[in-house]
Amino acid sequence: MAIHGYDGKAALQQVNQFWSMLDDMCENNPEEYRSFIQRQMREGAEFHSPPQSHTCIRTAVLGANEGILYINICGWKRVPAPASDKEPVPVCGGRMEKLTEEKEEYSVVDAAFNPEVLQTTEKDKEEKENLCLLALNFIQQQHNLTLSQHYKLTNDKIKGSIRDTKQRLMSTKTCKSTLNGSQSEPAPSLLQQICSLQNTESDEDSSIELSIEQERKPARSGLIEVISSTELDQPQPQLPKHQLTICPDGNGSSRILQLCVELPGVRSVSQCQLRISEDDILLEVEDIYYLLLPFPELVKEETCTAKFNKKKQTLNVTVNVL
């Protein structure tokens, strides 16, 4: 997947330096290395945490496409906080969805701010009103709409569910600093450009073991996997065939969620990127497959293990249910 304004060669040089640093740290200071890896995993879990509902406003779409619009204002740790009180306030928005509930037809869209911004506005009624207007104007510009500036706070903090909100935000995410009008896709950090899947070869079944468990010792070979991207006009990725089941574990004391994904055409784990949170899983194979799957129940993402079978070209993911 291409990233505009992203220098692939420079990033790969940084990754090589980063790998060298980790290699030295693991060899010379194992405790510091372990602490570093665990800290990155905690921060990664926070980054992939779902948005939190805050306020829902109801307004009207004017003009040819007139109708009712609900805007969910939520907190999301993926959205950066402004560097200071004088800096622009970043906001992210997702796709708009048209729904029908009972006899009411309406549209719903989401505007996400950093949680610290929302906490600040809670202390000041005027600031909260300004935040609502910022969200309203942002959605108006993002979707090229004419919206009524008169809105009403709903009794519920969110229209729909957090899961739906997260899917809309992740599908076509746009970020903007609301005070200066600059708009851009958020650039991924260095660690986000590195595949975090650990792999070990098995001669018996030609499979590759993948794990994100914190307590396992990191493998010396293949701990970090560099993924480069190029600007190519490729067809849209397909939704792979998959099966999701929940069953008791071997002891019968808890339940596990099992996901089997068929990936025909995939021959190497280096093609796969896997991210998991407590309520969903994201699997990407560049330009081939894309799967964003909500879980029917919350899971303990730190217990997730995955196994890629090269012969069958399948990925099997197992994780404990909360």
From Swiss-Prot:
GO terms for cellular component: cytoplasm; R2TP complex; ribonucleoprotein complex. PANTHER family: PIH1 DOMAIN-CONTAINING PROTEIN 1 (PTHR22997), PIH1 DOMAIN-CONTAINING PROTEIN 2 (PTHR22997:SF6). This is PIH1 domain-containing protein 2. Belongs to the PIH1 family. GO terms for biological process: axonemal dynein complex assembly; box C/D snoRNP assembly; rRNA processing. It comes from Danio rerio. InterPro entries: PIH1/Kintoun_subfamily, PIH1_N, PIH1D1/2/3_CS-like.
